Amino acid sequence: MPTTIILGSQWGDEGKGKLSDILCQKAQICARAAGGHNAGHSVVANGVSYDFHLLPSGLINPNCENLIGSGVVVNVEAFFKELNALEEKGLKHVREKILISDRAHVNLTLHAAVDRAEEAQLEGNKKIGTTGRGIGPSYATKASRKGIRVHEIFKEAVFEKKLRTLAEGYKKQFGELFEYDVEEEIARFREYRKLLPNFVCDGPNFIDQAQKSGRDLLIEGANALMLDIDYGTYPYVTSSNTGFGGAVTGLALDYKQIKEVIGVVKAYTTRVGGGPFKTEDLGDAGTKLQEIGREWGVSTGRRRRCGWLDLVVLKYSQLINNYTSWNLTKLDILDTFPTIKVAVAYKDKETGEVIEHFPADLDYLDTLEVVYKEFEGWQTPITSVKTFDALPAQAQAYVKFIEEFTGIPVKWIGTGPARDDMIYL
């Protein structure tokens, strides 16, 4: 490879898992760099669907080692629950192929309780629409230097003191909104302390040795660029760096060893929870995209908001992440649309100025109109198509326009849910 990074280019749920599954078949190491068990994707292999939230999907490959990196917030209960689920579906030796960086922070039941309390304090459209799994509060305690790292789980007195201090502070802050039993959590970790030792490693050293020895690494990005804490639609974002920078720092990668950065982009756009979404379609087209695309979350079951592809967002995403290629996913979902729209710019309604960049000011963004380009639909199934030249001319034109507009080649095109439903360019 030797090091390949897969990143979401929109608001998540682009279909990163499918490409990860394909590429991890050749990878020797598959790693997660940031996020927690809030992100989820399904991988279909050998007729079986596997759900991944916290664990890298390289666990499907019997010859691939897997690492949860230092930038991830690790929920220990979710870690073991996910391992059990994979074993129940027939995957063997998964416990021998997964490691956790000792520098990763621990996501606790306490953090989920804080998440619920914080959302309860917000009103109406001010709600972020989090998954409720405490990812934001986990990163908040990390940033405030009060967090608990994985290696501290094994220092019982230190762990309990830090946890009790956190619980007392949040109880003072939220009062009755903070529903949490610290003794119950302490009891659970007495059991986890016995189960975890064989899974914990020095994460930076593991990656350093892997890159120096020339092993093929596949890095699975979680969430997506537009949910990045610095570059996303703040404050309607997650609490970690979800782009290229987060992948590098979350795993201590040697950037000189990175060969490819793949941006995964859905052929239309979806978003979960609150926040701006300029191309959202609240009419028939949006409903049709949601139903045909089966747009509801693996982690939460929530229905996703749907709309047209926004190339302003995509160019902005490319500016931040410097992709070397695109994986265009779910092109087949557009099979039945007579007309397909794509956003190519925004327009200031007062001045008439055409805006070709994605602004930081969300209030200003809300005032802008969307400038669309319309494409003729192909209105024929493409799932069985295996080469680009065999695609309908209208579908080819759609793909070529994305390449020309962004200046980045499309290297993979998803044409269906199965692993084999992929065109390689």
Swiss-Prot record:
Substrate binds at V298, S299, T300, G301, R302, R303, R304. Signal peptide: none annotated. It is an enzyme of class 6 (ligase). The keyword Ligase applies. Binds 1 Mg(2+) ion per subunit. Pathway: Purine metabolism; AMP biosynthesis via de novo pathway; AMP from IMP: step 1/2. GTP binds at residues 12-18, 40-42, 304, 330-332, 414-416. IMP binds at D13, E14, G15, K16, N38, A39, G40, H41, T131, R145, N223, T238, R302. It holds the Pfam family Adenylsucc_synt. The active site is at D13 (proton acceptor), H41 (proton donor). Mg(2+) binds at D13, G40. GO terms for molecular function: adenylosuccinate synthase activity; GTP binding; magnesium ion binding. The keyword Magnesium applies. Its EC number is 6.3.4.4. GO terms for cellular component: cytoplasm. Its cofactor is Mg(2+). Keywords: Cytoplasm, GTP-binding, Ligase, Magnesium, Metal-binding, Nucleotide-binding, Purine biosynthesis. It catalyses: IMP + L-aspartate + GTP = N(6)-(1,2-dicarboxyethyl)-AMP + GDP + phosphate + 2 H(+). Belongs to the adenylosuccinate synthetase family. Plays an important role in the de novo pathway and in the salvage pathway of purine nucleotide biosynthesis. Catalyzes the first committed step in the biosynthesis of AMP from IMP. NCBIfam families: PRK01117.1, purA. This is Adenylosuccinate synthetase.
